[in-house]
Amino acid sequence: VADYTYSSTDKLILNTTLTYSHDLIRVSSYIDIDSSKYTLDGIDFDIPQVESPFSHHRNILSWQTSALWTPIRWMMINGQYMFEHNDNRNVSTWSAGIVFNLLKKELKLKGSTAYNYRFPSMNDLYWRPGGNPDVKPEEGYSYDASISYRKSINKHLLFDAEVSGYLMNIDNWILWLPKDGNQWVWTPQNKRNVRSYGVELYGKTTFHYGELVSSLSGNYSWSQSRTRKKQHVDDNAYMRQIPYRPRFKWNLRWNIDYKDAFFVWQMTYTGRRFITTDESYATDPYSVH
């Protein structure tokens, strides 16, 4: 990694980074196969063929440059460009955003947009069984905006709150799904073009008194991630929630710190998640605490 930052004035900061990485994966299969595990309710499923061990590598060279400009004290504009060379494939991505600090920096407004491109991971490509060397990269555009508020109620009490929303249009979204109806082997697949949008709420109250610090925080998220194109006339997955993406999630967290002692309590709720593209099967909601 090589990194360089230059600032001619307090209003403009430039940065550039050059990164190289070498990924290596070695894959082998289990040799002993228990055929009884491929029989369910008297139905015999195909036993997979054992493939020979192999290794694969890839070289990734990425260059990133960014600029942060503060034309006036309550506004910041940032932009970023990244070029990536990944095994003879060249990709450019970018992002741009703006931040407004208002009411003596108690109120903050943010917005950004970006073009995203994600290569499949080595596990997506070569995990055994199920890796798919032909899976395509994801790409698309994203937009997000947020408003946050931070207020000191008094010398002991601090309040934080934020509301944010986002929209993403992604082509070739990668999902791990059963291969050709075989429930035993799942493989990454490019499942259509997806539109994902949602809202997130966050709040936190912090109490300070001497060496005692206590905070109570919580967040709630609602998201809709649907396919936006039909693959055929009778496509039952069209405009359905994509698998494994719950519409609702929330959590609460309570922290107490005093000198070298601490206490943490947390509760997380995850809503129903569909496990098929036509929403015919789903997991029940659950909570953990």
PLM region spans:
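Outer-membrane beta-barrel translocator domains and adjoining extracellular loop/strand segments
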Residues: 1, 26-35, 89-94, 122-128, ...
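Extracellular loop and loop/strand-boundary signature of outer-membrane beta-barrel proteins
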Residues: 1-3, 46-54, 80-85, 127-135, ...
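Face-selective signature of the C-terminal outer-membrane beta-barrel domain
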Residues: 1-90, 162-165, 198-206, 213-221
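Hydrophobic, lipid-facing positions within transmembrane beta-strands of outer-membrane proteins
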Residues: 2, 59-65, 92-96, 131-133, ...
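Transmembrane beta-barrel strand/turn architecture of Gram-negative outer membrane proteins
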Residues: 2-6, 89-108, 143, 149, ...
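Transmembrane beta-strands of outer-membrane beta-barrel pores
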Residues: 20-26, 61, 81-87, 104, ...
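Gram-negative outer-membrane beta-barrel transporters
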Residues: 70-76, 159-169, 190-278
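Membrane-embedded beta-barrel scaffold of Gram-negative outer-membrane proteins
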Residues: 100-110, 137-197, 202-206, 210
